[in-house]
Design a protein with these regions (language model features):
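NTP/phosphate- and nucleic-acid-binding module
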Residues: 1-455
Length: 455
């Protein structure tokens, strides 16, 4: 079995598999595509949906101290002025004078193993020309509301979901009667006009965030910061991500955002190297105090036990759903020798697998199909299923392995003529067991639980 530390060439295999099997398609492909923009296909939409549901379950449903929110993508421009995004949500842009390609200066420095640009001459990676001096480029997309395109109608597409939580802090307190410490979670689209998007779905201009703002008493923030770092790392491990492919990296002081007291990234070893998967930040009381000052609305929390008003400090775990889906896809990918061929398997955790169980009649013989469809109808009410009767049973097993289906249920001639039982095949071991059709749902549930599922 090969290592899952994929080489650069193997990323091509991931992208090819993603398109061929319906995980991710290039967007607008019939018109030549549009850079770093992707559409999720039938399996990809299920994978990302399962990732989001796993996150929501762990953050909201299984906790008493976190509630949900879904705020608007377009908000008052004053929100982004108060938050600092209008003035400071920028990246350093450099341009090649000959080929006119644009790059992020900090990314070029990082590739050189440097952290500061002083005294460094940056050259174009393509033609070697000396790049321009960096200028700051605001990443927010502008648009206009209403029929008149003037300054009064200008708005921005949100670059993060967090601010929608902060401006609703008091609304949530009043509606839910929550007491500090508590959190507000949100999943939604955000938009950043990235200078150099890339690495497939890792960095795109339109992406989906899963963010939670956890409000704590000042002075207790360090303990909660440590708690959420450990909790979020464990979430990935619980979904089957290999421990050696994960690490924590604390930001150095010069890396910290203007609002942050501390920040730590959960990094994943992607084919191109270590990159941020999730960030956990101590945002202090910056956001609530800034919005109170700008809006004139009181956003301090009244602590009844202390008889004191204060702005809570905020611990923020922020994860991109697209990055999470990519990491899980890469981590699941395995190539195993199988005689003279290579067996490609996606060893997804069963709770995020797009299909949990496939029902496969041994052939398309008319006598098998009604029973196979009956078994499928019973299973699809309880699990994510797929019915497949095209091509040989061996090819169908391979196809299900390649999309990450944990279990396959095969209906054969003995099922209809002899024992009224089916064969259940395990993706990881390829072991097969015979189970009466009356017990197939329980057997599938037991099989999925044996692979780590919580069904």
């Amino acid at each position: 079995m090969t290592s899952r530390h994929l080489t650069e060439v193997d990323m091509t295999k991931i992208v090819s598999l993603a398109k061929r099997r319906g995980f991710v398609f290039p967007s607008s492909e019939i018109y030549g595509g549009i850079g770093s923009t992707w559409d999720y296909g039938p399996l990809g939409v299920e994978l990302k949906r399962n990732v989001k549901e796993a996150w929501w379950r762990s953050m909201v449903y299984e906790r008493d101290d976190v509630v949900g929110l879904d705020s608007a993508i377009i908000q008052s421009p004053e929100v982004w002025v108060a938050s600092g995004h209008a003035a400071g949500f920028t990246d350093p842009l450099v341009e090649c004078p000959t080929c006119h390609k644009r790059y992020r200066a900090d990314h070029l420095l990082e590739a050189m193993g440097l952290k500061a640009a002083e005294g460094v001459v940056l050259k174009c990676p393509d033609d070697g020309a000396v790049l321009s001096e960096p200028r700051m480029f605001n990443l927010m997309f502008e648009t206009y509301v209403g029929p008149v395109r003037d300054s009064a109608a200008k708005v921005w597409l949100r670059p993060e979901t967090a601010q929608g939580i902060f401006i609703n802090f008091d609304n949530v307190i009043v509606a839910t009667r929550k007491k500090v410490p508590f959190g507000i979670a949100q999943i939604g689209k955000s938009f950043r006009n990235e200078i150099t998007p890339g690495n497939f779905i890792f960095r795109t201009r339109e992406f989906e965030q899963m963010e939670m703002e956890f409000f704590v008493k000042p002075g207790e923030d360090d303990a909660w910061y440590d708690y959420w770092i450990k909790t979020r790392l464990q979430w990935f491990l619980d979904l089957g991500v290999r421990e050696e492919n994960l690490r924590l990296r604390a930001h150095e002081e010069q890396e910290l955002a203007h609002y942050a007291k501390g920040a730590t990234d959960v990094e994943y070893l992607f084919p191109w190297g270590w990159s941020e998967l999730e960030g956990i930040a101590n945002r202090t009381d910056f956001d609530l105090s800034a919005h109170e000052a700008a809006s004139g609305q009181k956003l301090k929390y009244f602590d009844q036990e202390l008889n004191e008003h204060y702005w809570p400090y905020v611990i923020e775990p922020a994860l991109g759903a697209d990055r999470a889906a990519l990491a899980l896809l890469v981590d699941a990918y395995e190539e195993e020798p199988d005689k003279d061929e290579v067996r490609v398997v996606l060893k997804f955790h069963p709770d995020i697998a797009p299909v949990q169980v496939a029902v496969l009649p041994l052939s398309r013989k008319a006598e098998l199909l009604p029973k196979a469809q009956e078994v499928h109808a019973a299973l699809r009410r309880q699990f994510r299923t797929q019915y497949d009767d095209a091509q040989s049973i061996g090819r169908r097993y391979r196809r299900q392995d390649e999309i990450g289906t944990p279990l396959c249920v095969t209906v054969d001639f003995e099922t209809v003529n002899a024992d009224d039982a089916v064969t259940i095949r395990n993706r990881d071991t390829m072991a097969q067991v015979r189970v009466p059709t009356a017990e197939v749902a329980d057997a599938v549930r037991e099989g999925l639980r044996g692979m780590g599922s919580r069904v």
